[in-house]
Amino acid sequence: MKVFLVHHGEAAGPDVDPRRPLTAAGRTAVERLAIAAAARGAKPVVVWHSGKLRAKQTAEEFWRRCNALAEFAATKDLQPDDPPQWMLHRLRGETRDVLIAGHFHHLPRLHALMVGTDETSAGFPPHGVVALETLDEGQTWSELWRLEP
């Protein structure tokens, strides 16, 4: 099973638009990353996002580029301040390849839990993608590759 952790693209500030959609530069960077992820073989069966507009827009681009037949849904446990253990527990029950479009500080903490490192040393790339794989139903994870904008 593979998991693709995707930090949403650059978003407008709340003073520009309180919904915080992706900026034009953010959309362009997300499109490039999605194309590159697809070229590396990213083909999730399910795409989850936090429900926030910027994460949804990011997830939609990856869904279009990587597997437009994938299940697509907003899901709980992906808000910036949610404990990452909740999502890790959910992933242990999954057998499908999953793409998660979410936020800092949640994604670096989830990544650190998955690979067993200190959050600060994990170095999750801002607005980037990290691909991980488990061969033992989510007990241990290894990083396959990462992409930065």
Residues of each region from the PLM?
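Domain-level recognition of soluble alpha/beta enzyme cores
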Residues: 117-142, 146-148
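Active-site-proximal alpha-helix that buttresses catalytic centers in soluble enzyme cores
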Residues: 2-82, 107-108, 117-129
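A glycine-rich beta-strand to alpha-helix segment
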Residues: 96-112
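Residue-level signal for well-ordered alpha-helical positions
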Residues: 61-62, 113-114, 135
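Glycine-rich phosphate-binding loop signature in dinucleotide/nucleotide-binding domains
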Residues: 40-43, 92-96
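Short phosphate-binding loop-to-helix
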Residues: 76-95
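Short, low-complexity, intrinsically disordered N-terminal peptides in bacterial proteins
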Residues: 1-2, 149
